[in-house]
Amino acid sequence: MGRGRWRTAGSALVRVLLVWAVSTLTMLVLAGILPDFRLQSDDGDSITQIGLTAVWAAGAFGLLSALVWPLVVRALLLVPALVLGLLVFFLNGSLLLIALGLIPDGRSEAAPETAVVVAAVMSAVASATSTALAVRDDEAYRRRLYRLADRRRRRQGGAAGTPRGAEAPPGLLLLQLDGVGYEVLRHACADALMPTVAGWLEHGHRARPWRTDWSSQTGASQLGILHGSNFDVPAFRWYEKHTGEVMVCNRPTSAAELQRRAIERTGHGGLLTLDGASRGNLFSGGADQLALVLSVSARRGRANRSRAGYFAYFSDPANAVRTAVSFVAEVVREVWQSVRARIRGDRPRVSRGGLYPLIRAFATVVERDVVVAAVIGDMLAGRSAIYADLVAYDEVAHHSGPRGRDTDRVLERLDRSIALIARVAEHAPRRYRIVLLSDHGQSPGETFLGRYGLTLKDLVRAGCGLPVSRRAGRTRSGAEARAAVLAALHRPVEEDEEAHPGRGSEPVVLASGNLGLISFPGIPGRASRARIERAHPALLTTLANHPGVGFLLVDGVVLGRDGAVARLDVPGEAEALLAPFGPGAAEAVRRTDAFPHVADVMVNSAYDPRTGAVHAFEEQIGSHGGLGGDQGRPFLMWPTELSDPDPGLHPDPGLHQGLDPASDPDPDPRQVQELVGAEAVHAVLRRWLREADGPQVPVAPPMGGAAAEPAGRPVEEPPPGGGNSGSFPSAGVPARDEIR
């Protein structure tokens, strides 16, 4: 054992010396290239003296980075993440200036702006060298990973996990590719955009679509997947009359309240309650290990900082610099892609200026890097269940469209992240079964504003006889709505100003993708159709007959074009009216109609089954949130050692690339049994956890290592026996193992 430790220490010393040598050479090269950076005195020095100065400066910079950087990042935890990323260059440059100041006799100096460049290059080169050495020395890398796992077991005092020498049951890693629909996944694999995922589908994985609820967006889907209930989540944002507040799924206070309601309704903490980790999600899933989780982001406790995930990542200066460089590159890429789309005259197109390039870079670079690093740390720690959300595709697809060159590049980078995670999984202290899934897809289409020249809010206000902007009033839709109001009120056109109701009756109009919500604060409770028509005689007719509107839901009644009406409580009526929106549309609408906080009027945009296009009520040319098209068909992809999501479905084992027959254009209806709703996905994931002898879902946090079952609830069935486990393919390079 002593000899092994000496060998390990010797290898570590050699790696440090090699990184130091490469950093020294890099500094010498930069001193020769950059005019404002020198490593010699004003009188000149010998080559030997210049070399010694570079050795001193490189060593001082490396030591300062290792000692000071974690403290600086911890002090900046409360700084907004975007600002923290931009400060990386300044902080690294400052450390270099300090290092140069430590050299005796003033033999080195650099202009501040040059110091930033030198520090960035040196950090990137040092990081690349360290990674290359780790790749070459597989044994040292593997020993380091197992040491990290042993440290975790020692910290837990052996109470948790598997005893030394015993094989741990396999863990479950759930990676959510936000917004990637089933058809997008199929094409990405067929077009070699995602070779890692395609390889899994050919050897050991299978994929199938599942159907979302009417509210096809992350808030509803992820709440259902992680907590088992998305009841009373009618949209991404909605108005609650009893409080007078607008709930927004990506607002921290709203997310915390939605999570509280789901826990209260289900009676358990969530999917990840025992030894789980939640990374980059809206909700915690009951996990103790959290990073970038919105529902707890308002907490400021020492043990659960809102941006603890950033500290775990940015405490390594090389990671910080690498991410900062990628951040800047992504901003430049977005600006160029936006200009290119404008020059080519691409249609449809939305504005991509303002802060959007920074927002996109944060989602596609910073959040991706932090989440991937956190997942790697979770695997090295051997956690039983991990759920992480990678949001890059969804963010880009909103502004570039679900299909195209921009999103193709994002899918390629997502595949590289998956490959990196799979490579690290091979060195984890336990095997991991990797499941990929998405929360929704995206449907393309020109925005409602771009197609008709006015927003849904403009149309509603015009239909209520309220003032609208001159631009909206001059559109055909606005003029028709205004005329309908006057006709309904039996007033001549010149008397339209008398038709304006008081301000207290103005509706609240909200948009969630191609789903619109209209609430009347002045009407207590849920407004009936008759009550709305008395207050605003032309509104419902104006909306239902608009070419950009597919249908309305008003108090148990579905309204379509040309006076079509279907009652939800009459069998078959809604199914016939909503048939163009796909199977299950009527049932999804019927479920939402039962929500306490459903809006007075729910508006789903028009949908073209031939093109799959919808009209978002927001400025998005790739949208989701309602019914129509690929937005309602996300995917679930699992290793075949796990049971089928639906035991009644037996896919053809010879089907190409492991894709499910549910995707066939003309499937056998006796064979296809689709998963419906996020709550059904939650049930499948719970079953897979049980199959791995993994965590159960308790009513409350476990006491004394055991979780009690709630009274009156059935005891979990024992896990099914058997099942051989396969390994996952290797790809990419190992991650820096210092990230925990």
Predicted regions and their residues:
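Juxtamembrane/disordered regions of integral membrane proteins
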Residues: 1-114, 128-133, 137
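His/Asp/Glu-rich, glycine-adjacent segments
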Residues: 135-140, 230-384, 389-401, 517, ...
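Active-site nucleophile/metal-coordination loop of metallo-enzymes that catalyze phosphate/sulfate
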Residues: 182-319, 468-521, 526-528, 694
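A long, amphipathic alpha-helix that forms part
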Residues: 365-366, 370, 378, 386, ...
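Metal-dependent active-site segment of extracytoplasmic phospho-/sulfohydrolases and closely related
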Residues: 415-453, 557-559, 564-566
